[in-house]
Amino acid sequence: EFTTLFLLFSVLLLSASAEQCGSQAGGALCASGLCCSKFGWCGDTNDYCGPGNCQSQCPGGPGPSGDLGGVISNSMFDQMLNHRNDNACQGKGNFYSYNAFISAAGSFPGFGTTGDITARKREIAAFFAQTSHETTGGWPTAPDGPYAWGYCFLREQGSPGDYCTPSSQWPCAPGRKYFGRGPIQISHNYNYGPCGRAIGVDLLNNPDLVATDSVISFKSAIWFWMTPQSPKPSCHDVITGRWQPSGVDQAANRVPGFGVITNIINGGLECGHGSDSRVQDRIGFYRRYCGILGVSPGDNLDCGNQRSFGNGLLVDTM
């Protein structure tokens, strides 16, 4: 009888102190960077995170191919974003930290770990290039150049509106505004809603978590990066070579390369009309980061001759 009571108490204690995750919970994610065990529970010990025990949000993976730290080190991160803690930047105080990035990335298997080392480095360079443009505090004559000032801002600059589109699926919460926040400057209730559901946070009622919680902030950007929204492929699939353009894409000059990622993000405003200073800014960040990571940028960096997929999912804030 004692043994039965002890086991029952243990089960109840486990249920109260852990969150279900993974295949046992419809793909739910663990909070706070915890690992999801093969049994569907969240934790941070070897029983949850170790080889053979972890089903998702695992630290790296088997061998170099799964180790994001082997693609971008802490020192490279600091070199790429070397003015993010400038006194003029909202992110000063190390809001955008390397540890927060690595923790957030662990929730998205495949991010920065797909393909050979060249593909993995290009993905990281492309991700930080696009998000650096969205958050840049640089100017043409800035110290160390304009492409050393990514990740300066947390929130959309100026006087943004509420970006609320009436929706029964993603209803706006009273008094909440869905302007651009975080590395990708996610905006609109119809993006905050599905992003929050995917990462296990109520962003419709708490949108400012994207600008106050470092890990959630990075997760919002990586969620957008990894998520296709038809007819657009995901940025991840484009940069890793998994996306194959259809006949419609080819007729629109949408071919694999960094330029299509710009088209995905803000093609309605930036692509299809020749040279655009915003597109060139994105390319400038990308070339710099490829240099730091030691990889070539590949082909098709511009989108000036591409027809857009349509309006961007994001509002261009810079």
From Swiss-Prot:
<keyword id="KW-0378">Hydrolase</keyword>
<dbReference type="GO" id="GO:0008061">
    <property type="term" value="F:chitin binding"/>
</dbReference>
<dbReference type="InterPro" id="IPR000726">
    <property type="entry name" value="Glyco_hydro_19_cat"/>
</dbReference>
<feature type="disulfide bond">
    <location>
        <begin position="30"/>
        <end position="42"/>
    </location>
</feature>
<keyword id="KW-0732">Signal</keyword>
<feature type="disulfide bond">
    <location>
        <begin position="89"/>
        <end position="152"/>
    </location>
</feature>
<dbReference type="InterPro" id="IPR016283">
    <property type="entry name" value="Glyco_hydro_19"/>
</dbReference>
<dbReference type="Pfam" id="PF00182">
    <property type="entry name" value="Glyco_hydro_19"/>
</dbReference>
<dbReference type="GO" id="GO:0008843">
    <property type="term" value="F:endochitinase activity"/>
</dbReference>
<keyword id="KW-0624">Polysaccharide degradation</keyword>
<feature type="active site" description="Proton donor">
    <location>
        <position position="134"/>
    </location>
</feature>
<dbReference type="InterPro" id="IPR036861">
    <property type="entry name" value="Endochitinase-like_sf"/>
</dbReference>
<dbReference type="GO" id="GO:0000272">
    <property type="term" value="P:polysaccharide catabolic process"/>
</dbReference>
<protein>
    <recommendedName>
        <fullName>Endochitinase 1</fullName>
        <ecNumber>3.2.1.14</ecNumber>
    </recommendedName>
</protein>
<feature type="signal peptide">
    <location>
        <begin position="1"/>
        <end position="18"/>
    </location>
</feature>
<keyword id="KW-0926">Vacuole</keyword>
<comment type="function">
    <text>Defense against chitin-containing fungal pathogens.</text>
</comment>
<dbReference type="Pfam" id="PF00187">
    <property type="entry name" value="Chitin_bind_1"/>
</dbReference>
<feature type="disulfide bond">
    <location>
        <begin position="35"/>
        <end position="49"/>
    </location>
</feature>
<comment type="similarity">
    <text>Belongs to the glycosyl hydrolase 19 family. Chitinase class I subfamily.</text>
</comment>
<dbReference type="GO" id="GO:0006032">
    <property type="term" value="P:chitin catabolic process"/>
</dbReference>
<keyword id="KW-0611">Plant defense</keyword>
<feature type="disulfide bond">
    <location>
        <begin position="271"/>
        <end position="303"/>
    </location>
</feature>
<feature type="propeptide" description="Removed in mature form, vacuolar targeting">
    <location>
        <begin position="312"/>
        <end position="318"/>
    </location>
</feature>
<dbReference type="GO" id="GO:0006952">
    <property type="term" value="P:defense response"/>
</dbReference>
<keyword id="KW-1015">Disulfide bond</keyword>
<keyword id="KW-0326">Glycosidase</keyword>
<dbReference type="InterPro" id="IPR001002">
    <property type="entry name" value="Chitin-bd_1"/>
</dbReference>
<dbReference type="InterPro" id="IPR023346">
    <property type="entry name" value="Lysozyme-like_dom_sf"/>
</dbReference>
<dbReference type="GO" id="GO:0016998">
    <property type="term" value="P:cell wall macromolecule catabolic process"/>
</dbReference>
<dbReference type="GO" id="GO:0005773">
    <property type="term" value="C:vacuole"/>
</dbReference>
<feature type="disulfide bond">
    <location>
        <begin position="54"/>
        <end position="58"/>
    </location>
</feature>
<feature type="domain" description="Chitin-binding type-1">
    <location>
        <begin position="19"/>
        <end position="60"/>
    </location>
</feature>
<feature type="disulfide bond">
    <location>
        <begin position="21"/>
        <end position="36"/>
    </location>
</feature>
<keyword id="KW-0119">Carbohydrate metabolism</keyword>
<keyword id="KW-0146">Chitin degradation</keyword>
<dbReference type="GO" id="GO:0004568">
    <property type="term" value="F:chitinase activity"/>
</dbReference>
<feature type="disulfide bond">
    <location>
        <begin position="164"/>
        <end position="172"/>
    </location>
</feature>
<keyword id="KW-0147">Chitin-binding</keyword>
<dbReference type="InterPro" id="IPR018371">
    <property type="entry name" value="Chitin-binding_1_CS"/>
</dbReference>
